[in-house]
């Protein structure tokens, strides 16, 4: 459970894929977060947990964009003042979208522009299409991503195709989308936890801004490990997220949040921190936080956010 009483944090889904992911985040029930589902298709805006925002007007009659990103962009631009009002006084804004379709690729960059203009730290979390969806949809996704980069401080990219290459086992189509949604949801929740949780060694919004503002592509990893070799297991797991497009090698900025019970040794904390830091650039800006959590038992938990990744 995440509780936030100190800053306005907004999570906005744009298009069908983005809205589905935002609903997953809302289902985790972090408090003090504002959720919007933004779409040109009025039928898609039916979640009780998320406030619906319909991009209507001359460019959309409530029936979507038919894969036309230009229509999605025009619909968002026509409603720009309304979008700007959604992010008034917002400190951190997450923009979730599935790229390749008309609304996600066309409208998401304009939504990010509104969040950025309102002064929010703007973090985009996006997916790219499967290869079987065709070259045209991939081109639309790539063009949307380039527009999104103009207005986002940080971007997490999840290529759907990585689901196939990340496992040797057969996976159902439904489970593939669940995995993709899980990565997107966990990425958002990780940042929310770091921002909103009171820690023994604290990480605040100024720290997050220092690492993520105007940072470009970022990597997010989460892991827990227990047992005799838990340090090596933890580091190997948290520094490798095969579903993301970018790894964390040579990162220019790094946020590390560790939690463990009161029996964790200083040597273990030191070893974990050093091993994770070894993956970054020599002059990386590293910000570190820690909190005790006896509910973890023998487990150590770590979350990392790496910026300026290649």
Which positions does each model-derived feature cover?
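Tubulin/FtsZ superfamily GTPase core signature
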Residues: 1-310
């Amino acid at each position: 459970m995440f509780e936030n009483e100190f800053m306005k944090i907004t999570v906005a889904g744009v298009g069908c894929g983005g809205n589905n992911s935002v609903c997953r985040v809302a289902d985790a029930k972090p408090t003090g977060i504002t959720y919007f589902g933004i779409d040109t298709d009025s039928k898609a805006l039916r979640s009780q947990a998320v406030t619906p925002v319909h991009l209507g007007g001359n460019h959309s009659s409530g029936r979507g964009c038919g894969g036309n990103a230009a229509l999605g962009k025009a619909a968002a631009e026509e409603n720009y003042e309304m979008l700007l009002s959604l992010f008034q006084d917002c400190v951190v804004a997450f923009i979730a979208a599935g790229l390749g379709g008309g609304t996600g690729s066309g409208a998401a960059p304009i939504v990010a522009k509104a969040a950025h203009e309102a002064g929010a730290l703007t973090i985009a979390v996006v997916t790219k299409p499967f290869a079987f969806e065709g070259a045209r949809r991939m081109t639309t996704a790539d063009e949307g991503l380039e527009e999104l980069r103009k207005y986002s401080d940080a971007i997490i990219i999840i290529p759907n195709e990585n689901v196939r290459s990340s496992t040797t086992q057969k996976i159902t189509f439904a489970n593939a989308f669940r995995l993709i949604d899980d990565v997107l949801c966990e990425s958002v929740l990780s940042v929310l936890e770091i921002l909103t949780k009171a820690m023994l060694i604290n990480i605040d919004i100024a720290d997050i801004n220092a690492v993520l503002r105007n940072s470009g592509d970022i990597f997010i990893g989460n892991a827990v490990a227990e047992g005799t070799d838990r340090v090596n297991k933890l580091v190997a797991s948290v520094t490798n997220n095969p579903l993301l497009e970018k790894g964390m090698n040579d990162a220019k900025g790094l946020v590390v949040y560790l939690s463990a019970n009161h029996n964790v040794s200083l040597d273990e904390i030191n070893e974990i921190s050093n091993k994770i830091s070894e993956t970054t650039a020599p002059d990386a800006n590293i910000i570190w936080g820690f909190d005790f959590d006896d509910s973890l038992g023998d487990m150590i938990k770590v979350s990392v956010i790496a910026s300026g990744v290649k």
